[in-house]
UniProtKB/Swiss-Prot annotation:
It comes from Homo sapiens (Human). PANTHER family: TRNA(HIS) GUANYLYLTRANSFERASE-RELATED (PTHR12729:SF6). This is Probable tRNA(His) guanylyltransferase. Changing residue 63 to A: Slightly reduced enzyme activity. It is found in: Cytoplasm; Mitochondrion outer membrane. The lineage of its organism: Eukaryota, Metazoa, Chordata, Craniata, Vertebrata. Its cofactor is Mg(2+). Changing residue 227 to A: Loss of enzyme activity.
Amino acid sequence: MWGACKVKVHDSLATISITLRRYLRLGATMAKSKFEYVRDFEADDTCLAHCWVVVRLDGRNFHRFAEKHNFAKPNDSRALQLMTKCAQTVMEELEDIVIAYGQSDEYSFVFKRKTNWFKRRASKFMTHVASQFASSYVFYWRDYFEDQPLLYPPGFDGRVVVYPSNQTLKDYLSWRQADCHINNLYNTVFWALIQQSGLTPVQAQGRLQGTLAADKNEILFSEFNINYNNELPMYRKGTVLIWQKVDEVMTKEIKLPTEMEGKKMAVTRTRTKPVPLHCDIIGDAFWKEHPEILDEDS
């Protein structure tokens, strides 16, 4: 009797197994419809292996955006701090980013050489970074512009470039910081001529046409008593974001076995987070101080 039951159970399981396999095969066949051929038109945008992947974002038409939202000239610390907050959010979301650099309305994000995020597809790198950054800009706006409502959503365009060596990556970041210095020096003199000397924008532009860096420094010092080297490093050098260990103090409720109610106590914990620095990255000192950034296994 028991033997007969075992045979029936075994036969039933075998029947169920055969039926299940048929349904799975049918599902797989249905999933591959006649329309699936359109996937063949997708371009292969895989980034080269063993190269640094850099995503650079730029604000779209930010001159108009800055005017509409009453940004301070030549620099608005609120706007720069908001940009950095957005960049930190991107780095915390995409942890394969080893360093970021930002100035004015742009930010560059460097993914480690061995990253395999998004199967190294350039379109995925660019769209994930751009969407996370833009949504963060809107989300955190009120934290930095309490009295200025956001009149319309900002836009950011992005591009992806791969750099084959440590030196080319360092040269890229040096280029962006040099660009920060050139633009900020010009803007500092330009707006001093307008705000303090009463020149029109056209007149200020004409005054600065053909001048060198030394000439601009001389105008600032002799006419406005401004030593450019004393301007905030955030304005002159931009912002570098790197991962560092930071001690954070938080309040936690601790309940001892002998007590009925818990007590709130300050607890210090250490975590790694993107930390902003305003320092020179063109020279070798920064890279010697932070060798882990270019480490293959960082």
